[in-house]
Regions:
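Contiguous surface segments at macromolecular interaction interfaces
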Residues: 1-50, 131-248
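Short beta-strand-centered aromatic/proline hotspots
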Residues: 115-132
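Conserved hydrophobic/aromatic beta-strand scaffold that supports enzyme active sites
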Residues: 5, 103, 123-125
């Protein structure tokens, strides 16, 4: 079994700043949409999602209600998550053997309501049920939903991961990754996660004493292979999912 720590949403390079926490709720802002050779890759604006003011504030006025956003991952009212991936990031997931039954934990950069401290936190999950390749065309249902990866191909290996998923409705301490008072990239890691157990994090100087991990500054998908019998990581994962679901 694999746990994928999947970095998503606004940050200082994509969007311009951290996503907000509003009345105790983490609100992950989708990154701005791009156009590709196939045409418009989004039919959704920040205003459509009720995020116009938040996008304007986080981007310092560079974005607003009328700007198109890359609405992905997409969480549905039916309790599903639709997550598109492609290019090198998708190739990495395939090489790591990610598939049905594995879990994505989406995390991003947020700003504390009080004090404004930027930090990383988990804001949602996807338990994979199926992987939908898009090279032969997107299912009509996904096009109708306006999923950006269904509207236009982003790369030759474009696909959508689909399964049960939820967003967290409260910014609880249990979902915070950044060490309190530290730079956003210094993360608290669970006891079961050790050096060699997370893709793109092989360097010894990233694994610090006291259960800390200095995360890489770039990249989207970081995979932890927890095997089929290890109990500690499974218990940790289920506690995270339970916290997300309880807050919803």
């Amino acid at each position: 079994m694999k746990i994928v720590f999947s970095r998503k949403g606004f940050d200082t390079s994509a969007g311009g700043g951290p996503s907000p926490i509003v009345a105790g709720r983490p609100v992950s802002l989708p990154i701005p949409a791009a156009r590709n050779a196939a045409g418009a890759a989004s039919v959704t604006t920040y205003g459509d999602l009720g995020l116009g003011e938040h996008a304007a504030r986080a981007s310092r006025g560079r974005l607003g209600a009328g700007d198109a956003c890359h609405h992905d991952p997409m969480f549905t009212r039916e309790g599903e998550c639709l997550f598109g991936q492609c290019g090198a990031a998708q190739t990495h997931l395939e090489r790591q053997g990610v598939g049905a039954g594995d879990v994505f934990l989406f995390f991003g950069l947020f700003r504390e309501e009080s004090g404004g401290e930027p930090h990383h936190r988990i804001f949602g999950y996807l338990r994979v049920a199926e992987l939908i390749p898009l090279s032969a065309g997107a299912p009509a249902e996904l096009v109708e939903r306006g999923h950006p990866h269904a509207l236009a191909m982003h790369a030759r290996n474009d696909c959508i991961w689909r399964g049960e998923g939820r967003l967290a409705a409260r910014a609880s301490e249990a979902l915070r990754l950044t060490v309190p008072g530290a730079r956003p990239s210094l993360l608290r890691r669970p006891d079961w996660l050790r050096r060699g157990g997370l893709s793109y994090h092989d360097r010894a100087d990233r694994w610090l004493r006291g259960g800390k991990l200095r995360a890489v500054s770039r990249g989207q998908e970081f995979v932890a292979d927890i095997g089929s019998r290890r109990e500690a990581p499974r218990a940790w994962l289920e506690s995270v999912i339970a916290e997300i679901r309880a807050s919803g």
